[in-house]
């Protein structure tokens, strides 16, 4: 297997030497043991053994120094070792990693666990993220060595457990061999302590079993003193040891030792009290002081603009720009939110907010509104949202309503729904919102649904028609063009009126034959222009009405259709019988669109068609003609000599 190599940064390695207190430069072909104290594998310590290649075979410096893996285990006890985290070593040794197979364990690569060795005590088996990076053969080798180390650790634990049990047995034996004065010899050693041993005021020696009574009679408790039954218990306790040297007065009695320390029980004499260990409590590092974070107020003000000069407009201004502020500078804490708001307001008198007022954007806006208006805006929220919708759009009104009502979906939807630009938007939004599983999901997806509906209907982000600025002029020019074509066609073909056909309706009011229908058509055109310009609606229904399920009635269009039907009946009674079928087709198209717009595409028929075929064509294609009549934007001039049966 080819040795693993990589580029070497000599300067970074020299800096690493200086950081570790090594006052020399790296040498050519120097073997270094790398001790990595944590890396991508986890907190465990891993090793690798590399050699430095600084010169070529002729002794010339290499253009790019290299390092090479030695392929043997590293032993920090006898090798020159660099100890650093894996990330720091990668600065000098490009693409360095742990050793292959069991070489990553360094001194434990052969599976020999040494009790008490510092490198053995820090051993940690591979974690999951390290195992997943191993090949099959490498994994089997690593598991074999880890198994050996684990077995040795288990054996060591068993030996230490046996030693502990032996020491406990010796302790029980020593405690059982210490009799108490005035009490019979204790029973065989047991696990429970004898309470009499601690309650006796004196401690007697422990002679051998055959001579126990004789020793007690000859030695006595004090020199020439009475027996233990006549002693005053208030006297100091004395411990006597027959193995210590005493005065040779021939009596064999031990002298009194009033200054000797008292012995309460044999257990403290065998096990001295351990000093109390201090309680170590982990203290979390203090959090980052928010005051140390620099707020990019210029970037935020470039997005939001300057604060309004009128203090009453400040709360709504903050609510409209809350999302923009979060997009420029994410705000994790209330302290930073209060600092941002105070910086945007320029420390205006009476509007400075504290962190407890800025837990959320809603609380901050509510506090500002109370300070500027004197009351919480819930009672006039509908009017506030209407003004915001007129200036910023329904999406901004929705977001502001959500913040001011603490995510009350039903309340805000009831206020925003009448602000949507038309019945089609209301119906589409209601259909999309009904498909959501909960009110929380509806709140989150409301703006996305609204933008999708606006895009579908050809509206901008504020619900206005994309052609609102040029819609009125375009319609006026189109109407004027159709009227001019009607006049030119009548002047150029005088025989068309003599054939018993009526002139076009809705464009020439001077003829006097259809005054009411023409006026109705002009009024509808004016209503369309006014509705498109003022309401900013869409092309499908310029003047919508609220359906009955939302609280409305039949609406204006039902009355207009009834009036147009009466006008059509009067106009048909004044026209010749030959005009009936063509007039019905034209008036049906006018009933669906503005009154007076004729089906002009019939003028495009060829000159060779006779009257019968023209009538049949009008009858067969009445549906298509009605659809084309709704467009009302045909600019193809009428063909000369063609039958004008429907006109």
UniProtKB/Swiss-Prot annotation:
Residue positions of motif Nuclear localization signal: 536-557
Annotated spans, Nucleic acid-binding: 475-500
Composition bias type Low complexity, residue spans: 191-208, 248-257, 469-482, 503-543, 568-578, 614-647
Keywords: Capsid protein, Cytoplasmic inwards viral transport, DNA-binding, Host cytoplasm, Host nucleus, Host-virus interaction, Microtubular inwards viral transport, RNA-binding, Viral budding, Viral budding via the host ESCRT complexes, Viral nucleoprotein, Viral release from host cell, Virion, Virus entry into host cell
Domain of life, source organism: Viruses
Region (GR-box 3): 581-613
InterPro entries in the cross-refs: Gag_C, Gag_N
GO biological process: microtubule-dependent intracellular transport of viral material towards nucleus; symbiont entry into host cell; viral budding via host ESCRT complex; viral release from host cell
Chain intervals for the UniProt region annotation (Involved in viral assembly and export): 33-56
Motif (PTAP/PSAP motif): 258-261
Record-linked PANTHER family: LP07818P1, OS12G0136300 PROTEIN
Domain notes: Gag protein contains 3 glycine-arginine motifs (GR-boxes) necessary for RNA packaging, the first of which has nucleic acid binding properties in vitro. Late-budding domains (L domains) are short sequence motifs essential for viral particle budding. They recruit proteins of the host ESCRT machinery (Endosomal Sorting Complex Required for Transport) or ESCRT-associated proteins. Gag protein contains a PTAP/PSAP motif, which interacts with the UEV domain of TSG101.
Note: Foamy viruses are distinct from other retroviruses in many respects. Their protease is active as an uncleaved Pro-Pol protein. Mature particles do not include the usual processed retroviral structural protein (MA, CA and NC), but instead contain two large Gag proteins. Their functional nucleic acid appears to be either RNA or dsDNA (up to 20% of extracellular particles), because they probably proceed either to an early (before integration) or late reverse transcription (after assembly). Foamy viruses have the ability to retrotranspose intracellularly with high efficiency.
Function field: Involved in capsid formation and genome binding. Shortly after infection, interaction between incoming particle-associated Gag proteins and host dynein allows centrosomal targeting of the viral genome (associated to Gag), prior to nucleus translocation and integration into host genome.
Name of the protein described by the UniProt record: Gag polyprotein
Organism from which the protein derives: Simian foamy virus type 1 (SFVmac)
